Amino acid sequence: MLTNPSQLILKNSDLFTSQNVLVLNCEGDLLPKQLLESASCVTTLSLDFHHHLVMSQHSSPNLTLHFGHQLPNADQTFDSVIIYYPKAKALAGYLLNLAGQHLKAEGELIVVGENKGGVKSIVKQIPDYFDTPFKRDNARHCLLFTSQLTQKAPSIKLSDWVNSYQLDTPQGELTICNLVGVFSEKRLDEGTKLLLSHLPRLSRRVLDFGCGAGVIAAALLKAQPELEIECVDINAMALKSCELTLEANNFTAKVYASDGLSQTQGHFDDIISNPPFHDGLKSTTDIAKSFVKESAQKLKSGGGWHIVANRHLPYSDTINEFFGQVNVLAENNKYKIYSNKINQK
């Protein structure tokens, strides 16, 4: 099943006849594979690891799949580049720069997105190395714009797209590096502050789930540099931000993509997280429950599980099911800190 933006791209597949096409910020469907009915070759760059996994079993000589913040070959060029307009508007500028770097001279840019997602902003955001975007199609509550590369685009520099700032935490001052598209308040958010203020001393091998820009991992290493921390996230920009944060503070940790806990290996002494499950929707709540279950399976006997969650979210029954009891370490009018031991009676 194709998303609405993907259906609009497929409707305009004549744009890609016999072309070498790059798709940036792919959605979680099989549009890249279906594009091969008109295009000669398709390359994808997914920023969401789950979306990458959806396509991963369909790779072929003419369908090359990548996950990350950039392509491995910075000099590779394409006849056309498709951008799925991102939810974070600031990320659009980065993707446009990336598209310009990888387009051949006079190559075509296609930008697609939902009306309510801000895709109309592309007209104002387009860099001067592209011509004025043309609204080619409008269907399924989506818009599709085309533009042409009119002059050589600058090579992308991460330093142009990262925001570095000092952050005070209960463990001390840290330098945080945020790439565009990664959540940041430029201050310690209330939930993370409550979590870091009430943490027990952790044991050797620690998993930071949904690491984001690496605030929690860096704070832990500031207090306990002996920890062996693994940082996982589903978002490529977050993972690179985390790497930059660790480097800026002279810390070392293993940083990698994982869909849930599926890509983690072995068992952990502690799992810590400010998980990105805040809206209370059933689909999100189901993911949160899966996280509790997977955590219990990934902890060593006696291992600790420490998370902060919006106090209205229904964690308690699931925690009790898999950990045997519910231990609220601290709470305020917005958040609860759950701190549980596996096999704890």
UniProtKB/Swiss-Prot annotation:
<dbReference type="InterPro" id="IPR007848">
    <property type="entry name" value="Small_mtfrase_dom"/>
</dbReference>
<keyword id="KW-0489">Methyltransferase</keyword>
<dbReference type="InterPro" id="IPR023543">
    <property type="entry name" value="rRNA_ssu_MeTfrase_C"/>
</dbReference>
<dbReference type="InterPro" id="IPR029063">
    <property type="entry name" value="SAM-dependent_MTases_sf"/>
</dbReference>
<dbReference type="GO" id="GO:0052914">
    <property type="term" value="F:16S rRNA (guanine(1207)-N(2))-methyltransferase activity"/>
</dbReference>
<dbReference type="GO" id="GO:0003676">
    <property type="term" value="F:nucleic acid binding"/>
</dbReference>
<comment type="subunit">
    <text>Monomer.</text>
</comment>
<dbReference type="InterPro" id="IPR002052">
    <property type="entry name" value="DNA_methylase_N6_adenine_CS"/>
</dbReference>
<dbReference type="Pfam" id="PF05175">
    <property type="entry name" value="MTS"/>
</dbReference>
<dbReference type="InterPro" id="IPR046977">
    <property type="entry name" value="RsmC/RlmG"/>
</dbReference>
<comment type="similarity">
    <text>Belongs to the methyltransferase superfamily. RsmC family.</text>
</comment>
<keyword id="KW-0963">Cytoplasm</keyword>
<keyword id="KW-0949">S-adenosyl-L-methionine</keyword>
<dbReference type="GO" id="GO:0005737">
    <property type="term" value="C:cytoplasm"/>
</dbReference>
<comment type="function">
    <text>Specifically methylates the guanine in position 1207 of 16S rRNA in the 30S particle.</text>
</comment>
<keyword id="KW-0808">Transferase</keyword>
<keyword id="KW-0698">rRNA processing</keyword>
<dbReference type="InterPro" id="IPR013675">
    <property type="entry name" value="Mtase_sm_N"/>
</dbReference>
<protein>
    <recommendedName>
        <fullName>Ribosomal RNA small subunit methyltransferase C</fullName>
        <ecNumber>2.1.1.172</ecNumber>
    </recommendedName>
</protein>
<dbReference type="Pfam" id="PF08468">
    <property type="entry name" value="MTS_N"/>
</dbReference>
